[in-house]
């Protein structure tokens, strides 16, 4: 398994599993014609890259000319705009958990940083692995790096060890020799970024000094390299994690506004520094990390793209793991409801504010991660994501840690996903009209969302209606990963994909049973909120009381912690709280069949937070008022 330590939205990641497909873009303008001609010429045997990459056991510096493409090729890339570059970058993959595998402590104890890349379970990178990724349909590779793996920064020495620098350069050369676009960054790197949030000005100054020194060395080393090499200002650290405490020992003091200001400052310093180094860095494409690399936070007006002396050479980086419970946990196994599509389509449309301003956008990480093979509906998730990338000019870069692409054998883990990658490689789309690609993508997005809506409607036994009283279980797991129609408005479409509900129509007095089955989407962990709801209950059956007779959890009788009562918050929906932590006192208007509110509680089903729940069944009695 691949181990690392990095947070996502304040969630500590320990393992990354993944696999997915990506989509290509098409170059327009005269630059496209030039590049196409160069590519055709390259088929005649010209590798397009001068120099030979270092062997895996080499620690000496690679040739200064390694990775440089032909002059015509470079001129074509140099002439591209940001959006044209994104289309040329096509479909990408991360070399995950490899050169960012953190072992700074080992370096301080005298270990050779050249060997750290296997520390998180990945094999030592070879040219064959990288070429295999290219052959699998990936045109871009992102190489995360932990540069302090070769640095004594605690002593104020920010010199990057030559052995680490040389190893990174060797892997970059592998990728350039495979005719791939290459992204290099500083990736988590032990959390040193938290120095920017220190209450001590001296520590903050050291952080900026180290950042500048790091990128000066990287920039100088690669200043003559191909324009296919892209520098990325950070990973996910420019945002809330500027207050991380791994290195400083205490949480930072920056408030939200100050975090935005500091992130903007770092990005600005990054651009100015790289441009000042000259060579190809004067107009190299630079990838600017968004705030937390989160779409919503990056679209906040407080985030600013930096100014640049080069024309249309800035790209924006964000990551996409939404919904987190499906993408990164085992609690949710399905994706594809109308609300899932609405959420994904809405966020990608929101992000288009940057492409509309002329900035190419890189989805620097995305994946559906699982411990056991490929999750159900992964193909739906990826296909729709890639269609959005085509529609809005984004370059998607799969997060992969030897999960989809098996580096040791140069094979892929799933034929269906592999075919999606291959079918969308740049080679298959480079001759198509850009607007035609966008139009086709939009049609697929709309058709897919419509089909999902129709399929869901067909599966609902009792759709909402003002003429019926429908009983159902409102439910949200403790981690909110699994839910079903929470709130006083009965909405059977508002649920985690895969939840099966056994709802009933109330027709008068009698005993009824409602249920929820989570087994097809995972297991719920405890409950943050749950209640029995009866839509239109107060209108169609005014004054009725509903008494919980029995609760079954996974088929076993659950001993209730109190007595149930009937109430309503809106005068329309009747509710019987099962677990409502926001209600500590029984409301005076509450009612029971026997008229006695003694021992009544809004928390009669108090499940442990981590208890796994597969099924819930509630049997209750409806009684008319006397």
Descriptions of predicted regions:
Residues 373-465:
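Aromatic-rich peripheral "rim/lid" segments of glycoside hydrolase catalytic domains that contact
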Residues 205-332, 348-369, 391-394:
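Active-site region of glycoside hydrolase catalytic domains
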Residues 58-140:
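N-terminal carbohydrate-binding accessory modules
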Residues 43-54:
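Bacterial lipoprotein signal-peptidase II cleavage site
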Residues 38-42:
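C-terminal motif of bacterial Sec signal peptides marking the signal peptidase cleavage site
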Residues 120-141, 151, 156-188, 192-233, ...:
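An active-site-proximal structural segment forming one wall of the substrate-binding cleft
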